[in-house]
Amino acid sequence: MSVFDYNRRPTSTTRVGDVLIGSDYPVRLQSMNNTSTNDIAASADQAERIAAAGADIDRLTAQGEREARSMGEIRKELRRRGCQIPLVADIHFNPKAAFAAATEVEKVRINPGNFVDPGRVFKQLEYTDEEYARELQKIEDTFGPFLELCRKHSTAVRIGVNHGSLSDRIM
């Protein structure tokens, strides 16, 4: 059996900068920087090497608003160099960083399990129905405006969920 002989589920097309993903477009290669996002020169250099090696998309971590703004500077530097690779902000536990990144990069990756909630401390939490409804409302009050900002700036959103980054509320 050939690794090139496979079937794909039908999907929609999504734009990440100038890169189209999904539907009948080829599977895209994404890499991730291991530089400090606040080191603009080193991050731009590595992103440029990643693009030259054949990646279609590059992801950087944005722990806070400062890193999210740095990604905008990295993007400007890459465009100045003629490198068009779209950038993805990898966000965990910090909706303010997600809001900042939405205006700076082509895609923001968030985890809805920790978008508003604090990091896990592995506590068993018990909620009344009323408390749980308030928690969900908190998420809706933050997530809705985030999606609206992304729509306004044509910023793609990847919702990534994995067990290790779910909040205590979900667990």
Role assignments for model-derived ranges:
Residues 1-60, 65-87, 92-171:
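Alpha/beta enzyme core
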